[in-house]
Amino acid sequence: MSRTQLPLALKPPRRPRFDNFIAGANRAVVATLAEGLEAGAWYFLGGAHGTGRSHLVAAVFADRCRRGERALFIALADRRQRPLLEQAGGDWVVIDDVDALGGDDDGERLLFNALNRWRAERTGVVMSGVSREAFRLPDLRSRLGQATRLTLKPLDEAELADMVTRLAAEHEVVLGRGVVDYMLSRAPRNAARMAQLVEAGARRALTERRTLSIPLVRELLGDHP
């Protein structure tokens, strides 16, 4: 493989942190997660797909670990992690995509029993999901209703443009003229998909030693419609 094929300058994937999250209208939510969590309390972080829920719950987990607290992270979109609900405990349990269990009778009972145990043990819980409406078990819906609700709003156009510019700077790639406007007009308008596009473009740009230009973005959107 030739040297020009290696993206030598590409930085490792960014670690989710509070300070590298483009908050936009969500500053109060981010502030609560970063500094306002109360020991033993429960929180439900809601929001549409692509609003940054996964980024923020990962940041919560990293932050609690940094503080020396006992924390466990469970990504329920991965079915293999569901058994962790039976084992989890400590100071904090952080759950991404909790609504992946919605409509699954066994999964809902597993979560309900875990929540009862965590309440008795005064374990703090931070959960993320689109909403709580997917759950059918009335007792579980009641339990989830005891969590403080935090809701993420989608970024507006100016905030998405700022995110694209900041991500490109982090990866040390040059944005071609008009590329931000092109991305906003052609790519899905959610933060997660836009970040994926910038990171894929940065990899290609650094590999091929070119700017992150409109033709490159057009190629990427053709590869990943």
For every predicted segment, state its role.
Residues R136, A147-E159:
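Conserved AAA+ ATPase "SRH/arginine-finger" region at the nucleotide-binding site
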Residues A187-G201:
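The conserved phosphate-sensing helix
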Residues G24, L33-G40:
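Phosphate-binding P-loop
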Residues L6-A28:
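Dynamic helix-loop-helix/coil hinge segments at AAA+ ATPase domain boundaries and subdomain interfaces
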